[in-house]
Amino acid sequence: MKIALTHRSALEALSVLAARSDVGNFPRTSLPAGFVSNAGAAQIERLQRAYGLREPIQTLSCAAASRRGRGTLERHRFNPVSMAQGFIELEPAVFASSPELCFIQLCNELDIVDAIRLLGWMA
């Protein structure tokens, strides 16, 4: 399974991660070259339980053809090269946007509490 969580889904996963440990202990990374998300339904359900993700799960899609999603997925198209060091690897092959990238992705829809939480992680 390979998946990159973005937007609200990444923020939810980072919140769970922060409750378990220090998000700062997780180094920033870039997505592997040629990264394509290939998580199946059972794997997505496991991530929902593990990280408290609400539907739709927001993920990165590098190719237009792979943007077609299941009802539980909302895919966002990005050029990962422009987001070097913009991800945190939560577990092998499961990435989430870094707090800084989450802030950029969500700045128009964050409430004040989530904005402050993100700013705290970025400090």
Language-model segment annotations:
Residues 1-123:
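Short gly/ser-rich loop at a beta-strand->alpha-helix junction or flexible surface loop bordering the NTP-binding
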